[in-house]
Swiss-Prot record:
One Gene Ontology cellular component annotation held by this UniProt entry: cytoplasm
Residue ranges crossing the lipid bilayer per the database entry: none
Cellular localisation: Cytoplasm
InterPro entries: RNase_HII, RNase_HII/HIII, RNase_HII/HIII_dom, RNaseH-like_sf, RNaseH_sf
PROSITE patterns: RNASE_H_2
Cofactor(s) essential for the protein: Mn(2+); Mg(2+)
Residues annotated as domain RNase H type-2: 72-257
Catalytic activity as recorded in UniProt: Endonucleolytic cleavage to 5'-phosphomonoester
Tagged with keyword Hydrolase: yes
Name of protein: Ribonuclease HII
Cofactor note: Manganese or magnesium. Binds 1 divalent metal ion per monomer in the absence of substrate. May bind a second metal ion after substrate binding.
Length: 257
């Protein structure tokens, strides 16, 4: 009778299983050892999770596929930074290829900072074109945050190296002469918008980290310009910086004091 492989050896040998129908799982199921049964459950859980992630990713390509089938380029557009008291609103436009294959690309808010940082260069490498559009604090104060976001999105679209035939936008209408699909929570429904949300978020986070070095004491690297206790204390102690939005209430109160 042949000796059973050790559990450590089994774990190593079965690490490459990528399909629930793999015949090796049947052999593992027949192994009565408690550790083998635990390993079976772990593998089944991993594969089920991966399959669910793949199905969700394919669902996020639903809006792009009809246009790709006609050979049209689709740009996803999203923004980050509408709510902070400091820093610009940053938008991104991303044109993905029809063979785009990074299943983890999802709404940036559902990803950790580490995951976003890992996905950022992968998106840049696979995308056909990527552009950033910025609405400065001065522009926000001049025309309000909603209109500044629209202008920033317009800049992102016009900055693309390739002309898109279709836009998928997260809940806004952009002033450009290109057909648009407006999606509520588009960053969770469209891979193109999700990619744009990640690019915009990582870009803005890096920018705010730079501002943190220029204007220490507000916690910009940690709070990204949002009105945290540290940020509000910095405003009270140090006053308003050139990157603060002067029409936003807490900043306005400091200026009027």
């Amino acid at each position: 009778m042949s000796k059973q492989p050790s559990l450590a050896q089994l774990k190593q040998d079965l690490a490459d299983i990528a399909d629930l129908n793999d015949s090796r799982l049947a052999s593992l199921a027949a192994d009565s050892r408690k550790g083998a049964q635990l390993l079976l459950k772990q593998i089944q859980h991993r594969l089920a999770k991966a399959e669910a992630a793949e199905q969700a990713f394919q669902a996020r390509l639903h809006y792009e596929r009809p246009f790709w089938a006609r050979g049209e380029r689709v740009a996803g557009i999203d923004e980050v930074g509408r709510g902070p008291l400091a820093g610009p609103v940053v938008t991104s436009a991303v044109i993905l290829p029809p063979d785009f294959d990074i299943p983890l690309v999802n709404d940036s808010k559902q990803l950790t900072a580490k995951e976003r940082e890992r996905l950022y260069p992968l998106i840049l490498a696979q995308a056909q074109s990527v552009s950033i559009g910025i609405g400065s604090p001065a522009l926000i104060d001049q025309i309000n945050i909603y209109q500044a976001t629209r202008v920033a999105m317009q800049r992102a679209v016009l900055g693309l190296g390739l002309a898109p035939q279709q836009l998928i936008v997260d809940a806004m209408q952009i002033p450009v002469d290109v057909p648009q699909i407006r999606l509520i929570k588009g960053d969770a429904k469209s891979a193109s918008v999700a990619a744009a949300s990640i690019v915009a978020k990582v870009y803005r986070d890096h920018l705010m980290a730079t501002y943190d070095e220029l204007y220490p004491g507000y916690g910009f690297a940690q709070n990204a310009g949002y009105g945290t206790a540290e940020h509000l204390q910095g405003l009270a102690d140090r006053g308003v910086t050139p990157i603060h939005r002067r029409t936003f209430s807490p900043v306005q109160k400091i200026l009027q004091a």
